[in-house]
Structures are given as structure tokens and as C-alpha cells.
A protein has these predicted regions:
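Sec-dependent bacterial lipoprotein signal peptides
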Residues: 1-18
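Extracytoplasmic cysteine-anchoring/structural motifs
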Residues: 18-256
Length: 256
């Protein structure tokens, strides 16, 4: 009889233990977004999204009250996805990524994208807003250069849901003031950037500036992208490129 009672008691204890375990999995996770590393001198607002595999969705525009501090929320336990964007409001970024409209350049965006398993009572995620854009500044050094228009083309049109460079058509016609023009570029996946010299509706010449930028030692894989300065000296029979301390000159025949 004692053995029978012990068996029943053991079974009840086992059932209770399973029940407690199941209840704990149903309890939410306390998610702490650590925003201490966000540079508030550069990023004034961040659009933050949180999704969990079980369907929870959170979106908040965080200003200086939150940036540089912590933000705490409760989320269902499971796989958690976090996105944060700064400087890209006009392009409505979100969990699906960021798409640059054809004909426009990249916003001066700072980004964080991550995913992790939140299965415990508490999870902490450090938000690192990386500089995911490069400002290309072009200085014109020749009177002939100003007689033409210029466009930058490429094969990256934004970022996908995991923060990777997204394949797509990119084109931006540059405008110049006092011989200086700028274009904001997204992080490149290859060296396919081109500079088109335009004569009205016609493309007069095309230069593979993506290759020149890489040859200059520029690194598109850095966490925080550097800006780029390029000097262009375009004459009737030659063109010279200078990117930082790197130089290249081309000569070509004039067909009359």
C-alpha cells in the first residue's frame, strides 16, 4: 500500500514539474534594449522595430529620452528580431528593409539588424547603430568637366531584412555647385559603381569608379563606412581620378 501511495505521489510530482515548466515557457521574457552606444550627437531619433516568431510586433520612434539609455519591454519567448534605423524617415524603412527609389540617392542611414533566441526570463540586446552609407564628394578640376552632366549608377538599391546590401538598380544624377557635387551611396556588395559622363540625353563616357574606389584601399565591409572624396580632372583627351592618395589617369582618342 505504501509503495502504491509513493508511486501516485511521484506521478503527481512529475506532472506538477511539467506543468511548472510549461508555465514558465508561457511567461514573457523581459527584453532590455541597451541603447548606451548610440551616438546621440549624430543620431537624434531611431525608428525601432521588434518582432517575435510568435507574432508580437513593436514599433517606436525613440528620441533623446531613450537613446543613450535602456528601453525595457516584455515579449513572448521565442526568436526575436530587432531593427533600428536612424536618418531614413523619408524612405519608411521597416522589418522588410530599406528600398531606395530609383533616381534618388541613399539616405544618411545608421542601422542595427539582429536576431536571437529569447528563451530565458531576461534578454539584453545591445543596439549598435552602424553608419551604413558613404558620402561621395566629387571635386571638378577642369573647365571641360562643367560642360557635361554626370550620373552615378550601381547594383545596390538599399538593404534587405537582414541588413545586407540589396541587389537592384541605382541611379543618381549629380548636381554641382562651385565645382563640387555629392551623392550618398549605400554599402556596396561589389565594385560595379559607374560614373556616366552625359551629353544631353546621350552617355558620352562611362568610368568604373567602383573599381577605382576599391583600388584606392577603400573597404566596403567596415562596420562604419568612411566617406569618399574624389577629384575629377576631365579634359578633351584624358581624365584623371584622385581618390584620397590614390590616382589614375586615362587617355583616349578624339573622334571628329
Amino acid at each position: 500500500m505504501k509503495m502504491k501511495l509513493w508511486g501516485i505521489a511521484a506521478g503527481l510530482l512529475c506532472m506538477a514539474a511539467c506543468s511548472v515548466k510549461e508555465d514558465r515557457m508561457e511567461c514573457p521574457c523581459r527584453l532590455v534594449l541597451d541603447l548606451h552606444d548610440v551616438d546621440t550627437s549624430v543620431i537624434k531619433e531611431a525608428d525601432v522595430y521588434v518582432e517575435v516568431s510568435r507574432g508580437f510586433v513593436f514599433n517606436e520612434v525613440m528620441d533623446s529620452c531613450y537613446l543613450g539609455n535602456e528601453y525595457v519591454m516584455s515579449v513572448p519567448k521565442g526568436r526575436v528580431y530587432v531593427w533600428a534605423y536612424g536618418g531614413a524617415d523619408e524612405y519608411s524603412p521597416g522589418p522588410e528593409g530599406l528600398k531606395i527609389p530609383y533616381g534618388e540617392d541613399c539616405p544618411e542611414v545608421y542601422m542595427h539588424c539582429s536576431s536571437f533566441d529569447a528563451l530565458q526570463e531576461k534578454a539584453v540586446e545591445k543596439i549598435s547603430m552602424l553608419k551604413n552609407h558613404a558620402v561621395l564628394t566629387v571635386h571638378l578640376q577642369s573647365e571641360y568637366t562643367s560642360a557635361y552632366e554626370m550620373a552615378i549608377t550601381g547594383n545596390v538599391d538599399g538593404y534587405d531584412a537582414e541588413g545586407r546590401s540589396r541587389e537592384g538598380g541605382f541611379r543618381y544624377e549629380m548636381s554641382f555647385e562651385d565645382g563640387v557635387g555629392k551623392v550618398v551611396l549605400p554599402r556596396q556588395a561589389d565594385a560595379s559603381l559607374k560614373l556616366e559622363i552625359l551629353d544631353g540625353n546621350d552617355t558620352f563616357r562611362v568610368f568604373s569608379i567602383g573599381e577605382y574606389i576599391v583600388s584606392s584601399g577603400y573597404d566596403w565591409t567596415r562596420d562604419n563606412l568612411d566617406d569618399i572624396t574624389m577629384t575629377l580632372d576631365y579634359a578633351l583627351s584624358s581624365v584623371g581620378f584622385r581618390i584620397n592618395d590614390w590616382e589614375k589617369e586615362y587617355h583616349f582618342d578624339i573622334v571628329i
